[in-house]
Amino acid sequence: MRTRRLPTENNYPTGSFEREDESDDSWFYASPRLVVHIDEGAIEAVSQLFKDLIPPNSTVLDLMSSWRSHWPQHHPKRRLTGLGLNAQEMEDNPDLTDYVVHNVNDDPALPFDDETFNAVVITVSPQYLTRPVDTFQHVNRVLRPSGIFIVTFSNRMFPTKAVRIWRASSDQGRMELVSSYMDAAGNFEDIKAGFINEEQSPPDDPIFAVVSRKSQETTDY
């Protein structure tokens, strides 16, 4: 069975994906930020989630990648590809095996063949997606059947680059929002969301996760 999905960002309220700063993202991210964006406890929570959910020796895409991927130590991987906006940040990322500079807000079509990856992760960056449903459709395309998609976020952001609907939402609302992106994109199943380090936060930065898997149904894009 094959199903055709169309972009559905227009199913959200008008202006949902507008930002205070609509300048070119490549300009905003041109200067490398060689820092982490969550604290050590939150990093440990993200790393443990990856270790728990991504099988050893997987082929993984770190979408919207930067200076660090928070890949768990001593967890073998076959390939960890970064896709982001700053080459210097990704060049200095010790977890990545390779990387590509690409702006998904300009072009959500990911530059990879169908069914390339066992897993795709977006780490503390979904708030910046201006075409999330389109992007998630292409995440589904590059995932192998039953491949896992893990989106994590905290309460930190560059507010001028975060989309309006994200800034206006609560933490619970943001989990529901990311879940809705997956649902609208189609061909994702077993969508689950949760506050993964609630017992440690505070003092640790909070980490929320939305996780799904590519279904066996084939989708045309």
Describe the residue ranges of each PLM region:
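A short glycine-rich, Lys/Arg-flanked "PGG" loop and its adjoining helix->strand segment in the class I
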Residues: 133-148
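A short SAM/SAH-binding and catalytic strip from SAM-dependent methyltransferases
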Residues: 118-133
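Conserved class I S-adenosyl-L-methionine
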Residues: 148-180
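Short alpha-helix
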Residues: 45, 169-195
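Class I SAM-dependent methyltransferase Rossmann-like catalytic core
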Residues: 2-55
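Core SAM-dependent methyltransferase catalytic element
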Residues: 186-187, 195-221
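Class I SAM-dependent methyltransferase SAM/SAH-binding core
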Residues: 48-111
